[in-house]
Amino acid sequence: SGEDAQPFLQGQLSCDVREISLQKAQYGSYCTPKGRMLASFLLWQHHDDCFMQLPASLLASVQKRLSLFVLRSKVQITDASDTWIQMGIAGQHVAALFEEITGLKLSSDQPMHIIHTEKVGILCFSQHRMQLITSTENAPALWERLSQYAKPVGIGCWDWLNIRSGIPIILPETQEAFLPDRKSV
């Protein structure tokens, strides 16, 4: 977060940070000076803050490394994982479930589109796959409501959907093994 967050991240990441907005997220990577991937992530904006979603096993090392380059930038790099919860939903009836939960009609089939409601951010990957982002305070009520219409299957299923969608996930074991252009980020 901070007033220099976007320019700072633009100089550090492989993606065009200027393309993210309150309505659009994107995938990117954080690389070594030689261009090898240290992390792959999902990046989006909420209010004036940029959020980077990456594997928990890389969080501390990426946060520490980015902090080294802050210098005089008006940027704060913090771990928000105790504040926000992500829930993935997938299936043929996701659009109907979205409408039931939010009371809104899904108006965009553009991938990586974000819709914000009072309590939930909805990241639309496709008509059949979404991620809900909510506060830890709101998560139990949202989970209860979702459970009335959907069956919890766990992170393994979500990881499989990521693989099937061609979304690269860099883990500690695969750091520096890939270049972003080989992984479409």
What are these regions (language model features)?
Residues 1-184:
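Basic, glycine/lysine-rich polyanion-binding surfaces/domains
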